[in-house]
UniProtKB/Swiss-Prot annotation:
Signal peptide extent: 1-3
Protein's gene: NTF3
Subcellular location: Secreted
Species of origin: Corallus caninus (Emerald tree boa)
UniProt name for this protein: Neurotrophin-3
Cellular component terms per the entry's GO annotation: axon; dendrite; extracellular space; synaptic vesicle
Length: 163
């Protein structure tokens, strides 16, 4: 998911599927590489781990054929994938104690003065909320109004695989 599409509030189904597929491939297929059986010259069977390239090729082929692996995304997988952290999204099993702060983002130090002048107005985090404005955490909400005024469904859980 590119940050530009997140900033604009546009999240296509393809980008979400791509993100979920990346999570699955990075967290599950690299940790649990499939084994295949091979025969040695004397006829005995041995198990051999597939290389990462073969596992990725199998995953790519499965995706093209419409095969969706059925997995549960647990907290351990999310803890391992720190590179998917975002200032806008936090994946956690636990309900937060308080809402996230709406503070100014830190401006990086830039050597180019022209770039600095263009960005003099600081941007606020959290100004584009996907949910209705509430002063408390809402856990039982099933629908909301997005930033364009459209009614959207709030997912309570994400199911992966064929329905």
């Amino acid at each position: 998911i590119q940050s530009t599409s997140m900033d604009q509030g546009i999240l296509t189904e393809d980008s979400m599927n791509s993100f979920i597929r990346t999570l699955i491939q990075a967290g599950i297929w690299k940790n649990k590489v499939p084994k295949q059986t091979a025969r040695t010259k004397d006829g005995t069977q041995t198990t051999v781990k597939k290389s990462e390239a073969e596992a990725d090729a199998t995953a790519s082929q499965d995706t093209r054929l419409g095969f969706q692996p059925v997995v549960s995304v647990d907290a351990e997988l999310l803890r391992q994938q720190r590179r998917f952290s975002s200032p806008r999204v936090l994946l956690s099993e636990n309900t937060p104690l308080e809402p996230p702060p709406l503070y100014l983002t830190e401006e990086p130090v830039v050597l180019n003065r022209t770039s600095r002048r263009k960005r003099e107005g600081k941007s606020h985090r959290g100004e584009y909320s996907v949910c209705d404005s509430e002063s408390r955490w809402v856990t039982d909400k099933s629908s909301a109004v997005d930033i364009r005024g459209h009614q959207v469904t709030v997912l309570g859980e994400i199911r992966m695989g064929p329905s």
